[in-house]
Amino acid sequence: MAQSTAFLRIGTRGSPLALVQARAVRARLAAAMGVEEDGIELVVIRTTGDIIQDRTLAEEGGKGLFTKEIEEALLDGRVDLAVHSAKDMPTVLPGGLILAACLEREDPRDVFISRKARSLAELPKAASLGTASLRRQAIAMRARPDLRVTPLRGNVETRLRKLNAGEVDATLLALAGLRRLGLTEHATHVMSADEFLPAVAQGAIGIETRTDNKRVRDTLAGIDHANTSTAVACERSFLEALDGSCKTPIAGHATIAGDAVQFRGLIARPDGSAAHDIAGTGHRKDAIIIGREAGRELKHRAGPGFFD
């Protein structure tokens, strides 16, 4: 096999959204390095999450299904960095890897999409809601316990196609993904973060590399969006304190204004029958502590049997 002559090799999934995100990172890196974009290679890697389409992520082991094979390529040197939807990254990264940078966050809110109603509240009684996200399921059922939740897997385009084919009455998707794909015309209603708290790191593009690769880490520092990285660090520390995975309905969202961090978090039972939420605020330098303490407090408040 011919040796790559690329300045950098970026590992990415092959879905349309993943490629849009990887190309955005490549463009930023090329500008920062003063090289042509074609000097930075995109290496498409198929992940377990891409292969498994008939079961939910919770059934198959939760977070990491969309990153495992890419992280293996990082660790064995086949790629120099990896681009992920930050919300798909495992709570604890494999040893030797680091979340080195984030691009500026896109709108983190969820959108309601349906041809039968203008909002979640207006769906007919016992309507079918298609989602593979336990967070979306729990928050939706908290408001509408009559809904029938149907697992809906696949990339954004696949889920929209299934909705349009009448397989479900409605679905919920990330606004960020629709925007990046130029598909916002499909959004029926944008849910406010107050009514539908986003997933941890939703809307953020995370860039992962090896801890010992100083050259790449230094390069990534030049394209990092500090406020996004601070918010994501706060949210991920909340997730880690809860031992969170795709098996657990968890939501968390941090915002940065000047030196202040505001954080909101939520845990729920999958059927929405019980939930606990929390808010915290403090200085941005304490963002990780704010998230961690919020997670510990909710874990204590909910009790050891909450997720059983």
Outline where the language-model segments fall:
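Small-molecule-sensing regulatory modules
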Residues: 2-46, 52, 59, 67, ...
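Non-catalytic, solvent-exposed segments at the cell envelope interface
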Residues: 62, 66-67, 71, 85, ...
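Short, Asp-centered acidic motifs that coordinate Mg2+ and/or phosphate
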Residues: 79-83, 169-170
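A conserved helix-loop-strand patch within extracytoplasmic ligand-binding domains
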Residues: 86-87, 95-147
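Short glycine-rich anion-binding loops that position phosphate/pyrophosphate groups of nucleotides
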Residues: 86-89, 176-178
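Short beta-strand segments
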Residues: 84-85, 113, 130-132, 172-174, ...
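Alpha-helical segments flanking ligand/cofactor-binding loops in enzyme cores
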Residues: 72, 120-121, 160-161
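Short, structured active-site "lid" loops
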Residues: 54-80
